[in-house]
Swiss-Prot record:
UniProt name for this protein: Glutamate 5-kinase
UniProt xrefs under PANTHER family: GLUTAMATE 5-KINASE, ISOPENTENYL PHOSPHATE KINASE
Binding site for ATP: 19, 178-179, 220-226
Residues annotated for substrate binding in this entry: 59, 146, 158
Chief location of this protein within or outside the cell: cytoplasm
Record-annotated PUA domain positions: 285-363
Entry similarity comment: Belongs to the glutamate 5-kinase family.
Gene: proB
Annotated metabolic or biological route of this protein: Amino-acid biosynthesis; L-proline biosynthesis; L-glutamate 5-semialdehyde from L-glutamate: step 1/2
Subcellular localization: Cytoplasm
SMART domains: PUA
Top-level taxonomic group: Bacteria
């Protein structure tokens, strides 16, 4: 047993989500690297043996489908990707099933779309299912349901999906294993002076600019999506590590007290369950632009958002839908559940709360978003 294995074994039992990207599972080739996959399964099995709960978020369905069909020439269209995903998902899960069986472990497949997370009841059902699997000693293997997901209902990438899965199962740690050692000060593939960032306490615009937007050609996630996932997870109280996913003992190395990667510390005050859903579940239906005074009240004082502070309403949304709250420059300030529709909010924007009933003929309270229904993003 390595030193890192011993340190993980000595730690308190934790729930750990391990996200494995396409580049990790293929090694940059066009086929699944089953020799490396068995090494990853071995480490997950060892974690489970040590008393930890493990959830795997696995990419690779499209790569597996392309391999199984003999690398056909297909048009670059959504239907082609869904075809490959439909064929490849069964191949991928069979591979994981056979590899985990070597260690006496059963797995359970969960295929999710954003629609499963946007509705609060379906969100809770997904949470109950994943927890039931874990409680019964079964390792959930989760992927986005690419065979049926359209752009409207896709989470978009397995980095963000893994953060949502972490919230579903109440994870302590999220490992984002990739083809890079972590987050660098610049792209290490282009800049030889790029330095690895060991620890992150706050995710700001500087970090987002560093992360950029591009990734590998085989997958859909680059470093930018990993940063988004880390931001979601850490706000839910989950520690996140971005680390290299190739080589021996990569999972134990990432979980060690001094991980070989970039560690994102969780926020000191983790969000309550309802606010975790607001942050992670629904896609925002519209934007509410607020003035600087309202920004200060929401961010620094934790106040509800009042109509007086609203300057502009963008998009269409109904009462009860999740919206984005931004400042005049377009920076995201918060996400929350709107107490009024976009039409009503446009009418009362900039008005005093006491005037709402005279303007609309009714009111749903003095707040356009109550603080209990709002997650502040700006730090």
């Amino acid at each position: 047993m390595t030193t890192n294995q011993q340190s993980v074994a000595a730690s308190q039992p934790k729930t750990i989500v391990v996200k494995l990207g396409t580049s990790v599972l293929t090694g940059g080739t066009l086929a699944l690297d089953r020799a490396h996959m068995v090494e990853l399964a071995r480490q997950c099995a060892e974690l489970k043996k040590q008393g930890h709960s493990v959830v795997v978020v696995s990419s690779g369905a499209i790569a597996a489908g392309r391999e199984h069909l003999g690398y056909p020439a297909l048009p670059n269209a959504m239907a082609s990707k869904q075809l490959l995903a439909a064929v490849g998902q069964s191949q991928l899960i069979q591979t994981w099933e056979s590899l985990f069986a070597l260690y006496g472990i059963k797995i359970g497949q969960m295929l999710l779309t954003r629609a499963d997370l946007e509705d609060r009841e379906r969100f809770l059902n997904a949470r109950d299912t994943i927890n039931a699997l874990v409680d019964n000693g079964i390792i959930p293997v989760v992927n986005e349901n690419d065979a049926v997901a359209t752009s409207e209902i896709k989470v978009g990438d397995n980095d963000n999906l893994s953060a949502l899965v972490g919230i579903l199962c109440g994870a302590d740690k999220l490992l984002l294993l990739t083809d890079q050692k972590g987050l660098y000060t610049a792209d290490p593939r282009k800049d030889p002076n790029a330095e690895l960032i060991k620890e992150v306490k706050v995710i700001d615009d500087t970090l987002r600019k560093i992360a950029g937007g591009s990734g590998t050609t085989l997958g859909t996630g680059g470093m930018a999506t990993k940063l988004q996932a880390a931001d979601i997870a850490r706000r839910a109280g989950i520690e996140v590590i971005i680390a290299a996913g190739r080589g021996q003992n990569v999972i134990f190395d990432a979980l060690s007290p001094a991980p070989q990667g970039t560690r994102f510390l969780p926020c000191e005050e983790a969000l309550e369950n309802r606010k975790r859903w607001i942050l992670a579940g629904p896609a925002a239906s519209g934007d509410i632009v607020i003035d600087q005074g309202a920004v200060k009240a929401v961010v620094e004082k934790g106040s509800s958002l009042l109509a007086k502070g609203v300057t502009k309403v963008l998009g269409e949304f109904s009462r009860g839908e999740v919206v984005r709250v931004t400042d005049a420059q377009g920076h995201l300030v918060a996400r929350g559940i709107a107490s009024y529709s976009n039409q009503d909010m446009a009418k009362i924007a900039g008005k005093h709360s006491k005037d709402i009933i005279s303007i609309l003929g009714y009111d749903y309270g003095s707040e356009v978003i109550h603080r209990d229904d709002m997650v502040v993003i700006q730090e």
